UniProtKB/Swiss-Prot annotation:
The modification N6-lipoyllysine is found at K65. PROSITE patterns: BIOTINYL_LIPOYL, LIPOYL. Keywords: Lipoyl. It comes from Aromatoleum aromaticum (strain DSM 19018 / LMG 30748 / EbN1). The glycine cleavage system catalyzes the degradation of glycine. The H protein shuttles the methylamine group of glycine from the P protein to the T protein. Binds 1 lipoyl cofactor covalently. This is Glycine cleavage system H protein. Its cofactor is (R)-lipoate. Belongs to the GcvH family. Disulfide bonds: none annotated. Pfam families: GCV_H. Residues 24-105 form the Lipoyl-binding domain. HAMAP family: GcvH.
Amino acid sequence: MSNVPAELKYTKSHEWIRVEADGSLTIGVTDHAQEALGDVVFLELPEAGRQLAAGEACAVIESVKAASDIYAPVDGEVIASNQDAVDAPESVNADAYAAWLFKLKPANAGDVAALLDAQGYQAEIANA
């Protein structure tokens, strides 16, 4: 069973979202996603300053098995990308919740409430 931390929010497309004290969002891929992908070998992340729409493909994660898009969970502006993860993509496999991919300043903080909680995400992956 995949690790699904209770304090995070989730999307049906397997991104996790941590709401930071300043209201910004830290985003990565879930443990379930990295298990399904296998060994991650490449990441392409959005640049700071890029405006994203909810559901927009904004990054790519490639493994030895497949390449998958990563989607913006809400509308907002990219404020940082994790160069350490780009330099060592295998870090996503080692700890999917420590190896964040990018940070987003949400256009509307209320949009985060509509994302899945841990229980909702667990139900989503159980039915997949």
